[in-house]
């Protein structure tokens, strides 16, 4: 799905971390870094967002919504509808979406600017409520992610992340959680090591780089 299959060919090889050691994750060495730069739809996302850490709650919520909605569809389709998602989901305001009622659900399911799938719409509302709850338990979504980045002293792998997400969130299978975390720097593999975007991201010291294996 998405970055994994849109012009991408994941080989399952391992990424060399900044320290020169091999990560133990089978990560994506894809051609996304070949075709996305300069592409009118993929280019800006590839160059400035994919793999770039952020702590902004609305941005994290947006990324989760987009990754969930991409399931079964192309990433290009989702990027083209991004403005529609922003309008439909109150600018990705967690508090607003968390209070959506049945009338809001019906509005979303009738909106051609987004993906009109009941399970995905319900997941967005539930996940907004889950994120809001994380403010009380951990201080916020970003703090929750940071608190669970390590497992037994090493970088938490995708399988462990999926188990954790499923305790609080809906529609969070392996591919969705993996891409969500990779896109935010919690897992390695968003870019090839020779990609200029990778070189820029390294300077930001994403979580996966802070805890090389």
Task: Outline where the language-model segments fall.
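Intrinsically disordered, low-complexity polyampholyte segments enriched for Lys and acidic residues
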Residues: 3-9, 17
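Generic low-complexity, intrinsically disordered sequence content enriched
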Residues: 19-20, 185
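Basic polycationic patches enriched in arginine
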Residues: 4, 21-24
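Intrinsic-disorder-associated, low-complexity terminal segments enriched in Asp/Asn/His/Tyr and depleted
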Residues: 9-10, 25
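HhH-family (HhH-GPD) DNA N-glycosylase catalytic core used in base-excision repair
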Residues: 25-213
């Amino acid at each position: 799905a998405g970055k994994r299959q849109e012009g991408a060919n994941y080989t399952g090889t391992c990424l060399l971390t900044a320290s020169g050691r091999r990560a133990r994750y089978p990560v994506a060495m894809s051609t996304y870094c070949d075709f996305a730069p300069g592409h009118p739809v993929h280019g800006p996302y590839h160059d400035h967002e994919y793999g770039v850490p952020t702590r902004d709650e609305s941005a994290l919520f947006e990324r989760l919504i987009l990754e969930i909605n991409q399931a079964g569809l192309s990433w290009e389709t989702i990027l083209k509808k991004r403005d529609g998602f922003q309008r439909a989901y109150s600018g990705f305001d967690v508090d607003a979406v968390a209070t959506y009622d049945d009338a809001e659900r019906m509005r979303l399911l009738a909106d051609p600017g987004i993906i009109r799938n009941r399970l995905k719409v319900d997941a967005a509302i539930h996940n907004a409520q889950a994120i809001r709850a994380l403010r009380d338990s951990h201080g916020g979504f970003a703090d929750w992610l940071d608190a669970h980045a390590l497992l037994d002293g090493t970088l938490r792998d995708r399988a462990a992340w999926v188990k954790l997400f499923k305790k609080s969130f809906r529609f969070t299978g392996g591919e969705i959680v993996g891409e969500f975390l990779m896109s935010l720097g919690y897992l390695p593999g968003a870019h090839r090591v020779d990609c200029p975007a990778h070189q820029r991201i390294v300077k930001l010291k994403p979580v996966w780089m802070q805890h090389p294996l």
